[in-house]
Design a protein with these regions (language model features):
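Conserved acetyl-CoA-binding loop-helix of GNAT-fold acetyltransferases
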Residues: 80, 85-98, 125
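C-terminal "cap" of GNAT-fold acetyltransferases
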Residues: 2-3, 9-10, 106-109, 113-121, ...
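Conserved acetyl-CoA binding element of GNAT-fold acetyltransferases
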Residues: 66, 71-82, 111
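Short amphipathic alpha-helix that is part of the acyltransferase structural core
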Residues: 1-33, 155
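Short, P/G- and charge-enriched loop/turn segments at secondary-structure junctions
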Residues: 36-40, 132-134
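A short helix-loop-beta-strand connector motif used in the catalytic cores of GNAT acetyltransferases and
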Residues: 40-51
Length: 158
């Protein structure tokens, strides 16, 4: 069981998780991904940054949503800390999808690198499908974009 709550992306806990995510991404892809994340994007209306904690209170992961279009939220900085317990990533993803629906988005899109096979498999397992590369990812063969229309019958989390 995980407690998931909004947090400031510049909070000490968020900075720890984002630094770990950056190091993991740099190891897998050669880039920490920080150039594609602006904390201001997840502070505005119809945006959020969430932190997950395990039952013992330890940090388990983070994730964010930002507005891409009126109908589409972009998932950013999704990270489940290794050793945080089974289900941290799934719990965070479900919370972010519920929040996207609460904000009025129809779809959730994201980008990751093709070489990050574990992430691609995780999202596909949770119903995401490969879509056209959008925005700055268009024409970039190393990028893979995925999207999903979340279940509108799920209860709102936040």
């Amino acid at each position: 069981m995980f407690a998931i709550a909004p947090a400031d992306p510049d909070s000490p806990d968020a900075r720890v998780l984002l630094a770990e995510l950056g190091a993991a991404l740099a190891h897998i892809t050669g880039s920490d991904g920080s150039a594609s994340f602006d904390a201001a994007d997840v502070r505005g209306p119809r945006a959020c940054f969430l932190v997950a904690r395990a039952a013992d209170g330890s940090l388990a992961g983070c994730g964010a949503l930002r507005s891409l279009t009126d109908d589409v939220a972009e998932l950013k900085r999704m990270y489940a800390r290794p050793g945080s317990g089974a289900g941290a990533g799934a719990a965070l993803l479900a919370a972010l999808e519920r929040q996207a629906l609460a904000f009025g988005y129809r779809d959730v899109w994201l980008e990751t690198r093709r070489v990050n096979a574990r992430a691609v498999a995780f999202y596909e397992k949770h119903g995401y499908r490969v879509i056209h590369n959008f925005g700055k990812y268009a024409g970039r063969p190393e990028a893979v974009c995925l999207g999903k229309r979340p279940d509108t019958r799920a209860p709102v989390f936040l």
